[in-house]
Every structure is written in structure tokens, then in C-alpha cells.
Amino acid sequence: MSAKNDNLFEKKLARLQEIVGALESGDLPLEKGMALYKEGATCARYCRQQLDKARHELEIWQDGQANPMSSQGHTAGEYPDDEAEEAEEA
């Protein structure tokens, strides 16, 4: 992510946290709560997209390093069972 996107991500995340706090307080009129919910959903969607993009970039980088991450969050060959599974698949 670029510095500009990092800053926007942080701002959107901070705003989302503010919105969640306001909604959890329960002290808002219905209309205000609905507006905040919609704004929060937009912030959450943006943050999720940026996180997905960053994860994809890391996966591409790791593939280039011949050390891809598995879905369990560890690298191939990190655990002894990995080598046995790879041999069975071959």
C-alpha cells in the first residue's frame, strides 16, 4: 500500500471504531444510528478491500520467494508432517 492509502486506511479504521462506539452506546436517535451504520459499513468495506489487496500482494511476493504460506498460517516445510503430505501428493 502507498503512504497515502496507509493514511486513508488508518483514518477509515479510526472512524469505524468511533462509529462502533457510538452505536454500542445506544444513545442515538434512529435516523442518526442508521446514517452511522451506513457510514460504518462503507468504512469497513474499504478496510476489508485494502487488507485483501495487501494479503494478495504478500502471497505474490511469497510465491516469488518459493515459500508460500498455507491456509493454516505457516510456511510449507515448517512442520514435519508437511514433507510427508507433499511426498504423498507426488
Swiss-Prot record:
Q: Which EC class does it fall in?
A: hydrolase
Q: Which GO terms describe its cellular component?
A: cytosol; exodeoxyribonuclease VII complex
Name the Gene Ontology molecular function terms of this record.
exodeoxyribonuclease VII activity
Where is this chain primarily localised? cytoplasm
Print the keywords alphabetically. Answer: Cytoplasm, Exonuclease, Hydrolase, Nuclease
Q: Where in the cell is it found?
A: Cytoplasm
Where are stretches of biased composition, namely Acidic residues? 79-90
Per its record, the protein catalyses: Exonucleolytic cleavage in either 5'- to 3'- or 3'- to 5'-direction to yield nucleoside 5'-phosphates
Q: Name one GO biological process term.
A: DNA catabolic process
Q: Where is the signal peptide?
A: none
Highest taxon of source: Bacteria
Compositional bias, Polar residues, is annotated for: 64-74
What family does this belong to?
Belongs to the XseB family.
Subunit structure of this chain's protein: Heterooligomer composed of large and small subunits.
- Record-given protein name: Exodeoxyribonuclease 7 small subunit
Q: Which organism is it from?
A: Desulfovibrio desulfuricans (strain ATCC 27774 / DSM 6949 / MB)
